[in-house]
Amino acid sequence: MRKLNGWLRKLKKDKKIFKKYWPWLARLTSDLPNSKTLKQKYPVFYKTALPEEASPDDRLGNFRRSGLKKMKAGPGLHLAMDVWKEHLHLIVPDPANAYKSDYSDHAAWCKAVHELNQNTYSTLLSQWRKKHSRRRNLWRDMKAIGLS
């Protein structure tokens, strides 16, 4: 448990490490005990940032989850969520790289940031307003998902 918590603390402290290892954090977060509670609390984050739920016959996934349960890793979920709240904005895709003016993924990532950390969302939004003010479809998709 100490090594897991140490790794999570490293991710929280260093954004470069977070950017490199966020897919592993996503897998860990979805495998941790009680991670299903995130589905109700942060539905867009759960759908956008975390990997899709595996099938019941996914042996490796079941093995990881049972191992984490045996380790009593449940409290690690709070630390993992602290890391996400701190750094999720770093992996939001840049609208400048959108394909055919489809910004629905960008809007979903923004909504996920909004769910976890409203201050960071406000900062990201102000940056986007300056940089992407002329992308009407971006703002349309943001509005459609409930953001402005």
Give each language-model segment a name.
Residues 1-148:
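Eukaryote-biased, non-catalytic alpha-solenoid scaffold regions
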